């Protein structure tokens, strides 16, 4: 069923926080790190900005369906594939989603296991993978509002921890930002390749952008003819959430 106005309880700021939470994860720095030393640190940042800007534009264009009509990905895809045929792109979309869920659950559980072993001497990675996965499933099942509330706590915390780790690592290796950005790349890959790599991290989410945007508050009705007025909130949230993170 389409999302009705009273169910649209997510502000543009809350949506921005949600995307910061989505983007602030280990996959982001891991992806960027794989591009060095083929590209310089500055080139990697430029590739990250360009790649995520393209993804943000795609998210906004496809998310327009959710903003205007309040329908999710599983519904709007039927217009192209039919009622039964819609299962095919649904399955294709589910494969990378399952992979990323498993991979990131393992990474999170591995970090928790390392902390637990350091503090208590006890280690049980399998148990933590199960518990961590269950917590994520419960949080998701509680709906977008529960996810948003969790991100209000998680996003700033992760950003602060990331900054602390950055400063700590730089001090340990006696590095400054000027020294980091003075390093060049060996040209092993092109900028175009790097942009595509950075796009690949979140490009699959562009398909189901309406799953998020259908909960956005709108000051205008779904029949508003001005595309920018309807979608500017989601565009800025996507852009600054992805690029800033």
Swiss-Prot record:
The keyword Iron does not apply. Pfam families: Transp_cyt_pur. The chain crosses the membrane at residues 13-33, 42-62, 71-91, 95-115, 127-147, 150-170, 187-207. One of its GO terms (cellular component) is plasma membrane. It is found in: Cell inner membrane. It is a multi-pass membrane protein. Keywords: Cell inner membrane, Cell membrane, Membrane, Plasmid, Transmembrane, Transmembrane helix, Transport. GO terms for molecular function: nucleobase transmembrane transporter activity. Belongs to the purine-cytosine permease (2.A.39) family. This is Uncharacterized protein in hyuC 3'region. It comes from Pseudomonas sp. (strain NS671). The lineage of its organism: Bacteria, Pseudomonadati, Pseudomonadota.
